[in-house]
């Protein structure tokens, strides 16, 4: 139970006891924004004033009378009727012991679900670019957190490995005798050439469409080339996933191809199809455009595939929740998709599906992050540059480091910096990509969080301790100790709000706050050789474990030295 949920339960019982005419209530409890106002604040007295026809302060006084003061150093009424709660140091000491146990086992939910998270999803025969970065990083982070709290998570890579583009590419490869391609770079060049020819040569276009049919019909030659194209692409994708430490299971669009005719047939049986301009569409009230599920030439599109995927994930994967992580530009598509899936019965209710949309990555001028020639920046090149920038940062700020030490640390710092900069931005917002900012040692950066963790490793080395014990106990005396204890106990709340909103920046904000509290504690409270060394090392152990856990959930790696 979090401190927030504990207070919510106390206030609910107090309100219902003080005012029996109120049948039910979900108390409005928030973390206090200033230490002056205690640890937490109840805001319900003002909200109940109109219903109860009483002054808010009188309501607050009635509520406070119903609450036991055992675990609090103070419960005060402030302003118009805010109830400010400050926990006692004894209660915080005991709560830290419970927190230590929960931290080791994970904050397990009582009713674990099957959660399918669809993220990354690059296209075959094309380089992954900076646009895939956010989907990959955000999706991985959410998957890690859902797993941490006990859910059964299926991470799916909905790779674009089917459609007209493959007929075009296969035809070009056959006719240009380029079947000995070895790299994704080769494929990308050939894809661009094929695309130009497809647009300019009507006969080539017809042959490409014939090859699409051949591929869909299982023609051995077309199939063999398609498999080769996929294998080369996936090998390049996996290289990036290895660098970013991403675990994901491939299930491309082609997987759902056998189910597409059945989807159309089922939608027609349920009278959901309307023929519009010779195409089969599903119209929904409140939307200006329909969801087209079959083109006028009888071909299927990605909406048909997405419907088949939605149905399969519910019926075969037994998903209780389906989360798809793509850019905000696809919001309307997924709104129409959800409406259609609900109407068709592929989704049991509105609580199953969530589209996790995200904003753009921008350059220093606020424009979409691209090369000077206007092309998307290749993700592999971006990651390589991040490592180079991390090397430069270490050489500047850590001149005493050997080349070997820098080479070992730079990949970790580079990937941490990129991930944290992305995840610390509200996912629906655009953000400006800046290596200079993301590799800073101060501010809300991965380097700053890691420095807090490394500082604890330094304490251990100086004391000759290999591992700090989580079996001890706290003895809070100083204000900085109290602030640090409270910060630690708020980690489960950060996890809760991150999962509720599906926004990782709540977790990064928490880690930044915790690291600041730890640095203040380190500044104010002498540890090594202090009469309180044991108790303060216990707080260090909890911070170390919390930072390591939080960084892991973000997909970041730790280092013992920086």
Swiss-Prot record:
* Motif 'HIGH' region in this chain: 122-132
Keyword ATP-binding attributed? yes
Pfam family membership, one: Arg_tRNA_synt_N
Keywords on record: Aminoacyl-tRNA synthetase, ATP-binding, Cytoplasm, Ligase, Nucleotide-binding, Protein biosynthesis
Q: Which locations, inside or outside the cell, does it occupy?
A: Cytoplasm
Give the GO molecular function terms: arginine-tRNA ligase activity; ATP binding
Q: Which reaction is the catalytic activity of this chain?
A: tRNA(Arg) + L-arginine + ATP = L-arginyl-tRNA(Arg) + AMP + diphosphate
Main location (coarse class):
cytoplasm
Identify which top EC class this enzyme belongs to: ligase
Task: Name the Gene3D superfamilies for this protein.
Answer: Arginyl tRNA synthetase N-terminal domain, HUPs, Isoleucyl-tRNA Synthetase, Domain 1
Could you tell me which InterPro entries the record lists for this protein? aa-tRNA-synth_I_CS, Arg-tRNA-ligase, Arg-tRNA-synth_N, Arg-tRNA-synth_N_sf, ArgRS_core, DALR_anticod-bd, Rossmann-like_a/b/a_fold, tRNAsynth_Ia_anticodon-bd
Q: What is known about its subunit structure?
A: Monomer.
What is the protein name stated in its UniProt record?
A: Arginine--tRNA ligase
Tell me the organism: Chlamydia abortus (strain DSM 27085 / S26/3) (Chlamydophila abortus)
